[in-house]
């Protein structure tokens, strides 16, 4: 593995972390080639997480929009309610293989934290989750859920007290406890081999979707659309389609209150190339290279960077990156709930918002797959607040 996607990616880390990364890459390479390991991974995806997830034809939505056929890849139906578990099961099996007794993770919306705590409970591992104090306030339900699962939740009070700071704390902890601790990163970010490893554990989404659409339609889709924070759900569904040049890949970032307001998280649209969390990629930073505060109604998308492979897909023109505002995401959230009886995560609602803009301009012969990366239970409070409803 080269660890680079064009000029992006790499391993911008202190010496102390280098050896752990080399060991991790070696073990991951071996595990990937090990039939027993992959079989065990697939066993847990199937029996524990409930895969394969359906590829659902959203007939009502399609008819109402009056254009392209819209299919939803139902990652919201996974155990713990999002795509996160695909990656966590893989990494925790790897931790077990490496004889690590303790796992740590960062979390923003709390979904990755919940998934990590869930798998740690099942495999009997000690688990500590780092979470920004701001996010803890926004996601109190997920915080309690992690504690219920036996994890220790450590509030991060530095910087903007959000995801970026939680990552920094997790890295600090990892460096200190490198012998017994495995760091479970939640997205296709961080130093090599993480972006590749997380993508490989998430590609099951795209592998299934490809097989399912061929079964249902006898051909590949015209568009595959997914939301992008760090970008693991998007990378997971994009990757198996990369060689299929006729399939357009579209990543949707969070435009927050608008791309010109400074209150957004659209690193591809407004960012520049820099280094954060051990990788070179597009970042929202000022002239001095300081990371700028980011904002989105959806806690899972407010990351100031993006996975390095996405940066490469953008630069090589293989994927296109667009954005949706809070307002558009909220409208899509309500719309899907009332049209299909599916309450999507606010993250996924960003992808949906763009698909709903695109579909009416296409013909009935066109096919769109939207990655419905998670369910919206965790967002009901947020949406109620926006609508002025007291719960």
Swiss-Prot record:
<keyword id="KW-0456">Lyase</keyword>
<dbReference type="InterPro" id="IPR006653">
    <property type="entry name" value="Trp_synth_b_CS"/>
</dbReference>
<dbReference type="InterPro" id="IPR006654">
    <property type="entry name" value="Trp_synth_beta"/>
</dbReference>
<dbReference type="InterPro" id="IPR001926">
    <property type="entry name" value="TrpB-like_PALP"/>
</dbReference>
<dbReference type="GO" id="GO:0004834">
    <property type="term" value="F:tryptophan synthase activity"/>
</dbReference>
<keyword id="KW-0028">Amino-acid biosynthesis</keyword>
<keyword id="KW-0057">Aromatic amino acid biosynthesis</keyword>
<dbReference type="InterPro" id="IPR023026">
    <property type="entry name" value="Trp_synth_beta/beta-like"/>
</dbReference>
<dbReference type="Pfam" id="PF00291">
    <property type="entry name" value="PALP"/>
</dbReference>
<comment type="pathway">
    <text>Amino-acid biosynthesis; L-tryptophan biosynthesis; L-tryptophan from chorismate: step 5/5.</text>
</comment>
<dbReference type="GO" id="GO:0005737">
    <property type="term" value="C:cytoplasm"/>
</dbReference>
<comment type="subunit">
    <text>Tetramer of two alpha and two beta chains.</text>
</comment>
<protein>
    <recommendedName>
        <fullName>Tryptophan synthase beta chain</fullName>
        <ecNumber>4.2.1.20</ecNumber>
    </recommendedName>
</protein>
<comment type="function">
    <text>The beta subunit is responsible for the synthesis of L-tryptophan from indole and L-serine.</text>
</comment>
<comment type="similarity">
    <text>Belongs to the TrpB family.</text>
</comment>
<keyword id="KW-0822">Tryptophan biosynthesis</keyword>
<dbReference type="InterPro" id="IPR036052">
    <property type="entry name" value="TrpB-like_PALP_sf"/>
</dbReference>
<feature type="modified residue" description="N6-(pyridoxal phosphate)lysine">
    <location>
        <position position="84"/>
    </location>
</feature>
<keyword id="KW-0663">Pyridoxal phosphate</keyword>
């Amino acid at each position: 593995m080269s660890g680079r996607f064009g000029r992006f990616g790499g391993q911008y880390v202190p010496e102390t972390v280098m050896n752990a990364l080399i060991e991790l890459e070696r073990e991951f390479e071996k595990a990937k080639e090990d039939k027993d390991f992959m079989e065990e991974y697939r066993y847990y995806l199937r029996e524990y997480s409930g895969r394969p997830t359906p590829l659902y034809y959203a007939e009502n939505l399609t008819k109402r929009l009056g254009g392209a056929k819209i299919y939803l890849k139902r990652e919201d139906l996974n155990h713990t309610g999002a795509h996160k578990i695909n990656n966590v099961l893989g990494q925790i099996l790897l931790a077990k293989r490496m004889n690590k007794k303790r796992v740590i993770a960062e979390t923003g919306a709390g979904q990755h934290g919940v998934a990590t705590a869930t798998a740690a409970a099942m495999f009997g591992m000690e688990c500590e989750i780092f979470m920004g104090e701001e996010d803890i306030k926004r996601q109190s339900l997920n915080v309690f859920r992690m504690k219920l699962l036996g994890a220790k939740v450590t509030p991060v009070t530095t910087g903007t007290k959000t995801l970026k700071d939680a990552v920094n704390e997790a890295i600090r902890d990892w460096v200190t406890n490198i012998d017994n601790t495995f760091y479970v990163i939640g997205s296709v970010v961080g130093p090599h081999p993480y972006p590749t490893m997380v993508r490989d554990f998430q590609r099951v989404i795209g592998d299934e979707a490809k097989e399912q659409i061929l079964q249902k339609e006898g051909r590949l889709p015209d568009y595959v659309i997914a939301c992008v924070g760090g970008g693991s759900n998007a990378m997971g569904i994009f990757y198996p389609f990369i060689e299929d040049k006729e399939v357009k890949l579209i990543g949707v970032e969070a435009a927050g209150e608008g791309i010109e307001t400074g209150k957004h998280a659209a690193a591809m649209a407004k960012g520049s190339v820099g280094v954060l969390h051990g990788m070179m990629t597009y970042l929202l930073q000022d002239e001095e290279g300081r990371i700028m505060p980011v904002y989105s109604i959806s806690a899972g998308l407010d990351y100031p960077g993006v996975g390095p492979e996405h940066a490469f897909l953008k630069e090589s023109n293989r994927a296109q990156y667009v954005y949706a505002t809070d307002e558009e995401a909220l409208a899509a959230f309500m719309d899907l709930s009332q049209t299909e009886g599916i309450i999507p995560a606010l993250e996924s609602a960003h992808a949906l918002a763009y698909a709903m803009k695109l579909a009416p301009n296409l013909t009935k012969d066109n096919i769109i797959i939207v990655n419905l990366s998670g369910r919206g239970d965790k967002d009901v409070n947020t949406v109620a607040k926006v609508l002025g409803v007291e719960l």
